[in-house]
């Protein structure tokens, strides 16, 4: 099973980034724009059939495949809407990684039935790779702030199963974020990952 997971992750890591649907020319506060922005955090074969939630967890579109797409930015949405999809930090999560996200936001221990996966093809605004819940680069550990482009995340049922991976995010290889904490997970860069930071 472990070797299967390694080969599966390797195939994702080397695959090209899937083309997102065309951004609608409408207000970023609109239901149509939000559905586009959040659902394109995953490849279309996942995002097109996923449930889409807004920042208040209200359903914008009911899905059919068990995945949920929503903004991942914990900061309040501006009155005029997010500037772009990157600022919204949207995620598309399966059932298990959604449990992980809820535990992370409530500072409780994730209780998963299996490993979970979460897509973020629009990237994020930055994280301290060593410490959870650091919102600003000025508060981060020196040299450990990374603003990510497109990536996939593996949220492990047991963090020890990924403990042997590097924490170095500068190599282009999958790496550990929040190592040693209950929120340790594997970051898997895909094409475009370093568009907001220095490439290897």
Model-derived features: positions:
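Sec-dependent signal peptide recognition
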Residues: 2-12
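Hydrophobic h-region of N-terminal signal peptides that target proteins for export
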Residues: 10-20
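Primary mode marks residue(s) on the alpha4-beta5-alpha5 output face of response regulator receiver
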Residues: 22-200
